Amino acid sequence: MIKVFKTNISDRKSADRVIMMLEDGYPEFMITIDTEDCDNVLRVQGHSMFSAEGIMDSILIMGFVVEEMY
């Protein structure tokens, strides 16, 4: 399963911090953030089903804006 999100995570330091936090909760997932894309795209890929809301809640708690892209 792959989910893609639009974020306001625009710098590498913040992206690395968010990725580390998400990897703690989802260690088996592949997680990337493209800070050079205009939408600062977060891509989460896992072998099992997962909730977009869980990912979004974690990012919102860190103070960032996130929106699932369809």
Named regions from a protein language model:
Residues E28-I33:
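A short linear hydrophobic-aromatic micro-motif
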Residues M1-S10:
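Short glycine-/aliphatic-rich beta-strand segments at the starts of folded cytosolic domains
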Residues D37-R43:
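Surface-exposed aromatic
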Residues K6, D16-I19, E36, H47-Y70:
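C-terminal structural segments of small proteins and small subunits
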Residues Y26, N40, G63-V65:
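Short, highly charged low-complexity linear segments
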Residues M1, L22-G25, L60:
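A general marker of short, structured functional hotspots
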Residues I9-Y26:
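Short amphipathic alpha-helix segments
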